[in-house]
């Protein structure tokens, strides 16, 4: 077992597990070392062997979808998507790049790893059905740690009706790696791409933006305070919501369902994983259009705004460039306006223009600020 562990803080279990039923009501954090957590119980992965580990991690994943003919237990899964399009997406999460185990509980990590994939399928106006999970772990992780990750994966599968149909687990020389592939279905003629936005279309977003990024800034701030001063209790009072948005995001299946109920088919759509500005660039570039979004129309969470003011941070910068909101950004025909305003939790933030007008944010005084694609980039 590795001897070197960085000291980190984790949520007090009695409080943070409330995040799974279904929201964080209050959070109280305690500090401990990773070594101390592992010492509570530590079953070496090698003691189970490959097949024993697979059985232990996947035995409580019942099949839920008719399209899954064969899941775990053979050389390959078998799916049947008769008369429907198949959608496939994949996301790779690397310790130290995409998550920090200083403050991310393993259960939440498993849940979030699933959600970021489901969100991509919903962003295509599809329905996610199956996932494949592959994990690389160093020797500092135990069977119990993997079970924690899989408990979060299982919860996401149960809530969203997803089948776990396969994957792989391998030793890693450093850290923790999680790769999830999600398979979903889309109806013919109903799949929404990024390249369909047209001049005069409305630009819409679900939910509110900036909370996940400000939650991350809060966690990073308190980590630095702990590492430099050894303070035992971080200051998270009144910040439950932004922590939830960072640690346990949700995919907006409800928005897709409501759009269908109101007979609205977006002309272009994607999820907001890397920041509003970056995603607007994707849609406008692929659709060969420009856009105008209005600062006073962008939905911003109250806790996010308060946190930004406390940290002397521009909340609009957080919204444009922060990311990890996993809300839906989409465009629709102007003729859908009356139907759109009947749907809760959707905001109209601007409109599509001709390409020569470029992309701009219209400030509260009417000034136009050129948008830049400065979203989060793991390769930088």
Residue ranges and their predicted role:
Residues 215-236:
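Short, compositionally biased
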Residues 233-281:
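Polyanion-binding loop/helix "lid" in catalytic or ligand-binding cores
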